Swiss-Prot record:
It holds the Pfam family EphA2_TM. One of its GO terms (biological process) is positive regulation of neuron projection development. Residues 622-883 form the Protein kinase domain. GO terms for cellular component: dendrite; early endosome; GABA-ergic synapse; plasma membrane; presynapse. It comes from Rattus norvegicus (Rat). This is Ephrin type-A receptor 3. Its EC number is 2.7.10.1. It catalyses: L-tyrosyl-[protein] + ATP = O-phospho-L-tyrosyl-[protein] + ADP + H(+).
Length: 984
């Protein structure tokens, strides 16, 4: 007992110092039993009674606690049991037992080596109810044997320091309503400082705005999936889930909730947006301040209300400022050309805060009293359109001549229809010029005699101005207009005398205004005898029937004669009966099965040629979207063509400008007549023409990438050599087709090649194949015409000798343009210098990185003797071989192997000729690189001469094109220093 007392006293002193190091209990542990928290005696069952003893002590807060100890180390065969009271399981599936104890080292106790132990045993028993003091050892199941990590000795007793051990054991699963714990001593000197029994749970938490309740793990083998619920004012974006582990930890968060519109995430809640702020959509976004000209007055707003006279269009996002309609357009200017007018105006001063401004044109036809106006005829045309204009100009055509019009130009934006104020428009009134009148429709015979006839007629339906007089043209029918007489009449009647008796005369009448004569009326025939009648008019159908019957009789007679002759066996030739016959029409001999180009200029009437080779389109099937440029004859527009039962396609539309001359009309229709004869994938395709309404239009397929030269300059050094050769092959194939048809283009250049989105090149611009008067690339020759000398062969420049061989020369220039990515041939040399240099045998230099085979093809195309140039058929064959053998395109001509008769390549600029880096870069058209080189170590010409491709990348020259030009120029400098300058 003395030993017991010493242990108790020392334990009471020691627990204080050891307990202060304890950490707080984790939040995921739920205590079922904690001996330290029990007030008063624990009341556990000790068996036998002289075994475990309950003693008192204090914790680190000097709070009394009850503990048990045993130290019967002197006696053999100890079997001392200590059982706790019945502990309810609650919701636990697995429990943990935490023991805090001290244990004495047996070696520190004399004379106990055979009886002292340094372990004790832990047991448990499940039950559905409390058994009271009843205790049966065999009902308990052993959990584990507990050993101390540290034991105390006699020296520790002297220092009054005891070493506290903590052991935790896991028990489970437990299924009954409660359980007991038991401690078996078999001869140790041990003190149970505290016993804590607990289970683990995943505590309530909020994750991704989802609440997860307290969750107890089910067993030790699997995770428990828990479905979360969204916090207030939020909704599921993805179903929120987490997994509760056996250690009471939440794992693997999946899904989330997001705050509703009008609320934002603040910590673990969704908080309403305060006044002046809004949130339009559910999600993670924060509340945003109301945009200009809008506000909110309450919490939780999903959008902001616009101020008075400000609006938000249906498709405007809530983040967009409220806007208002624009003010009226300004500075309207009209430019009248006969029966058309071009209207120009300035943008409104106030756009209302929007960019989607469009303009509508309201057309009114007014009498001479301006207040009496009515809507314009639907025949009036607006180019590009009447409504929804995005540019500040429109062309109005097909107006009536000598008529008052008022045009109101509305400025409209996306909120105009929401506003109540009146329309915002600017108005301009015009009077169209007088024009030639429409034809006289009917001529009436009033009276006649043997030598005279009196005629009358009505004023033209559309006088288009003030009628000044009428021109009466007449001739004897039998003369067939070889000899005719013209007289003028002031009014709508005339008496013609001095006629031959009993003779039929043909009459035509046309009216004249200040703008000129109108079209002649149709022909009317009258006989100057008292019984004559009009062949045109009511009796015309009788005459036509009689003529038709006579023709039929003649044809029948001829056919019968031929058949009888054949039946009788008479032959005028020995040719077989199935001999192909040749047909003559329009002055051209046509061979069956052979397609040959027909020059439309040989037709007397260009309309006849265009109708023979081109399809007439209905203007209502064409929609013009926008004007994209101006051509030789008028504007060039993009638009859409929708033919019945066919898919809508994009097209390019050329219009004939208002006030055209007859020559311009012939040339315009001539271009369509030329294109209409071609059918090849590398020739621009003609969709049709519009000639029966104004404006006259040529409609072709639409090429998205525009002209080849501009396209290549825009995409400098961005294509492989194979891609470039593919483009060149397409051009050569199209030119072979033209050459086979006997057509000479005369103006083959990269600017006249169009390229579509699939990089297919097509030859175009046939309107300049005859006349090039307006071409900026043209130069005067000795014959007085204009030709594009930079692309034209020497014989064509000197003698106007255009052939397929001269087109081959031009193709060589196009080849050079393609390989140099749209460089201007001969750069800034004057046209006269170009002619002189070519005549002296100089040729364009090798483009940078150009394969040797392609440059040789260029030189072949530039043979001075046209008979030595390749045919287009040969060019196509050469390019096909190169495409099939791409390795041959990797051979680059060295500087030493180049011909000596080359012009100086201006892409390789001599650094020595410039004083500054900027001058040198300007010379290579890489001035945009000047800022990059300014201030770096390569700011002088001497240092730049040593630069490499990697160095250029470091300073910011990352585009391949400028890199190649600079490196090529440096290499040229090295070559010139070794071999001398290249001749010019």
């Amino acid at each position: 007992m003395d030993c017991h007392l010493s242990i108790l006293i020392l334990f009471g002193c020691c627990v204080l110092s050891c307990s202060r190091e304890l950490s707080p209990q984790p939040s995921n542990e739920v205590n079922l039993l904690d001996s330290k928290t029990i007030q008063g005696e624990l009341g556990w069952i000790s068996y036998p009674s002289h075994g475990w003893e309950e003693i008192s002590g204090v914790d680190e807060h000097y709070t009394p606690i009850r503990t048990y100890q045993v130290c019967n180390v002197m006696d053999h065969s100890q079997n001392n049991w200590l059982r706790t009271n019945w502990v309810p399981r609650n919701s636990a599936q697995k429990i943990y037992v935490e023991l805090k104890f001290t244990l004495r080292d047996c070696n520190s106790i004399p004379l106990v080596l055979g009886t002292c132990k340094e372990t004790f045993n832990l047991y448990y028993m499940e039950s559905d109810d409390d058994h009271g003091v009843k205790f049966l050892e065999h009902q308990f199941t052993k959990i584990d044997t507990i050993a101390a990590d540290e034991s105390f000795t006699q020296m520790d007793l002297g220092d009054r320091i005891l070493k506290l051990n903590t052991e935790i054991r896991e028990v489970g699963p437990v299924n009954k309503k409660g359980f007991y714990l038991a401690f078996q001593d078999v001869g140790a000197c041990v003190a149970l400082v505290s016993v804590r029994v607990y289970f683990k749970k995943c505590p309530f938490t909020v994750k991704n705005l989802a609440m997860f309740p307290d969750t107890v793990p089910m067993d030790s083998q699997s995770l428990v999936e828990v479905r979360g619920s969204c916090v207030n004012n939020s909704k599921e974006e993805d179903p929120p889930r987490m997994y509760c582990s056996t250690e009471g930890e939440w794992l693997v968060p999946i899904g989330k909730c997001t705050c509703n519109a009008g609320y934002e995430e603040r910590g673990f809640i969704c908080q309403a947006c305060r006044p002046g702020f809004y949130k339009a959509l559910d999600g993670v976004a924060k509340c945003t301040k109301c945009p200009p000209h809008s506000s909110t007055q309450e919490d939780g707003s999903m959008n902001c209300r616009c101020e008075n006279n400000y609006f938000r269009a249906e498709k405007d996002p809530p983040s967009m400022a409220c806007t208002r309609p624009p003010s009226a357009p300004r500075n309207v200017i009209s430019n009248i050309n006969e029966t058309s007018v071009i209207l120009d105006w300035s943008w409104p001063l106030d756009t209302g805060g929007r960019k989607d401004i469009t303009f509508n044109i309201i057309c009114k036809k007014c009498g001479w009293n301006v207040r009496q106006c009515e809507p314009c005829s639907p025949n009036v045309r607006f180019l590009p359109r009447q409504l929804g204009l995005t540019n500040t100009t429109v062309t109005v055509t097909d107006l009536l001549a000598h008529t008052n019009y008022t045009f109101e130009i509305d400025a409209i934006n996306g909120v105009s229809e929401l506003s109540s104020p009146p329309r915002q428009f600017a108005a301009v009134s015009i009077t169209t010029n007088q024009a030639a009148p429409s034809p006289v429709m009917t001529i009436k015979k009033d009276r006649t005699s043997r030598n005279s006839i009196s005629l009358s007629w009505q004023e033209p339906e559309h006088p288009n101005g003030i009628i000044l007089d009428y021109e009466v043209k007449y001739y004897e029918k039998q003369e067939q207009e070889t000899s005719y007489t013209i007289l003028r009449a002031r009014g709508t009647n005339v008496t013609i005398s001095s006629l031959k008796p009993d003779t039929t005369y043909v009459f035509q009448i046309r009216a004249r205004t200040a703008a000129g004569y109108g079209t002649n009326s149709r022909k009317f025939e009258f006989e100057n005898s008292p019984d004559s009648f009009s062949i045109s008019g009511e009796n015309s159908h009788v005459v036509m029937i009689a003529i038709s019957a006579a023709v039929a009789i003649i044809v029948l007679t001829v056919v019968t004669y031929v058949l009888v002759g054949r039946f009788c066996g008479y032959h005028k030739s020995k040719h077989s009966s199935d001999e192909k016959r040749l047909h003559f029409g329009n002055g051209h001999l046509r061979l069956p099965g052979l397609r040959t180009y027909v020059d439309p200029h040989t037709y007397e009437d260009p309309t006849q040629a265009v109708h023979e080779f081109a399809k007439e389109l209905d203007a209502t099937n064409i929609a013009i979207d926008k004007v994209v440029g101006a051509g030789e004859f008028g504007e060039v527009c993009s638009g859409r063509l929708k033919l019945p039962s066919k898919k809508e396609i994009s097209v390019a539309i050329k219009t004939l400008k208002v006030g055209y001359t007859e020559k311009q009309r012939r040339d315009f229709l001539g271009e369509a007549s030329i294109m209409g004869q071609f059918d090849h994938p590398n020739i621009i395709r003609l969709e049709g023409v519009v000639t029966k309404s104004k404006p006259v239009m040529i409609v072709t397929e639409y090429m998205e990438n525009g002209s080849l030269d501009s396209f290549l300059r825009k995409h400098d050094a961005q294509f492989t050599v194979i891609q470039l050769v593919g483009m060149l092959r397409g051009i050569a194939s199209g030119m072979k087709y033209l050459s086979d048809m006997g057509y000479v283009h005369r103006d083959l250049a990269a600017r006249n090649i169009l390229i579509n989105s699939n990089l297919v090149c097509k030859v175009s611009d046939f309107g300049l194949s005859r006349v090039l008067e307006d071409d900026p690339e043209a130069a005067y020759t000795t014959r007085g015409g204009k030709i594009p000398v930079r692309w034209t062969s020497p014989e064509a420049t000197a003698y106007r000798k255009f052939t397929s061989a001269s087109d081959v020369w031009s193709y060589g220039i196009v080849l050079w343009e393609v390989m140099s990515y749209g460089e201007r041939p001969y750069w800034e040399m004057s046209n006269q210098d170009v002619i002189k240099a070519v005549d002296e045998g100089y040729r364009l230099p090798l483009p940078m990185d150009c394969p040797a085979a392609l440059y040789q093809l260029m030189l072949d195309c530039w043979q001075k003797d046209r008979n030595n140039r390749p045919k287009f058929e040969q060019i196509v064959s050469i390019l096909d071989k190169l495409i099939r053998n791409p390795g041959s395109l990797k051979i680059i001509t060295s500087a030493a192997a180049r011909p000596s008769n080359l012009l100086l390549d201006q892409s390789n600029v001599d650094i020595a000729t410039f004083h500054t880096t900027g001058d040198w870069l300007n010379g290579m058209r890489t001035a945009h690189c000047k800022e990059i080189f300014t201030g770096v170590e390569y700011s002088s010409c001497d240092t730049i001469a040593k630069i490499s491709t990697d160095d250029m990348k470091k300073v910011g020259v990352t585009v391949v094109g400028p890199q190649k030009k600079i490196i090529s120029s440096i290499k040229a400098l090295e070559t010139q220093s070794k071999n001398g300058p290249v001749p010019v």
